[in-house]
């Protein structure tokens, strides 16, 4: 392709510095991560990385605004911004299965999001994705290790949005504390490390994950 042709990837987790490390003209390349379903979900992460031409990042942000998308500027780290929130939300949910069912966990999660983690995992066939992305994040620490159950379960037995399983108050409190703990832990880390701005993080969570 021409040296001035823009090249982007829709990867959700691999840093641009790894994807494009052998590209001759690195300045015209970056990651633009869409969220499913892309025809409906407006959020797009636009990744700023060391080799990207700032004018390219600015142009892509303008282009997405002009086409009805919402660009969210993110630094070039493992899993960027929103996958760090979503993947670890799902991973923590799986670690809760020693004390609650998938339906109970999704019911409590429904107080905060439209659909619980297990319903979304079924929809996206996301179990292998969590294994891959959290294994990748283990470069930052053992605490990101994916729950082993993701390797042995194909489909979760859960409840759809708007439906609820019976959950006793003690169990509901434990689920709530763990899920919110994951959400706040990742959010604070993202802002503290300047992976993204607090405003883009909040907007992205509402649009892409809410």
Predicted features along the sequence, with ranges:
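N-terminal glycine-rich phosphate-binding loop for ADP-containing cofactors
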Residues: 1-210
């Amino acid at each position: 392709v021409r040296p001035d042709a823009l090249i982007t990837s829709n990867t959700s987790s691999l840093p641009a510095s790894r994807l494009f490390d052998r590209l001759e003209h690195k300045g015209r390349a970056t990651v633009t991560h869409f969220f499913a379903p892309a025809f409906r979900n407006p959020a797009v992460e636009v990744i700023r990385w060391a080799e990207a031409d700032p004018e390219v990042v600015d142009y892509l942000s303008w282009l997405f605004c002009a086409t009805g998308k919402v660009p969210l500027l993110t630094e070039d780290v493992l899993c960027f911004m929103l996958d760090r929130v979503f993947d670890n939300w799902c991973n923590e949910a799986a670690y809760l299965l020693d004390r609650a069912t998938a339906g109970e966990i999704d019911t409590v999660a429904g107080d905060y999001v439209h659909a619980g983690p297990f319903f979304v995992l079924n929809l996206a066939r996301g179990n292998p994705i969590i294994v891959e992305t959290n294994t990748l994040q283990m470069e930052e620490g053992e605490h990101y290790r994916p729950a082993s159950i993701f390797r042995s379960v194909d489909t979760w037995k859960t409840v759809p949005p708007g439906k609820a399983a019976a959950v006793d108050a003690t169990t509901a409190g434990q689920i709530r504390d763990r899920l919110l703990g994951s959400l706040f832990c990742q959010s604070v880390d993202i802002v503290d490390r300047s992976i993204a701005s607090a405003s883009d993080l909040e907007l992205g969570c509402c649009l892409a994950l809410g």
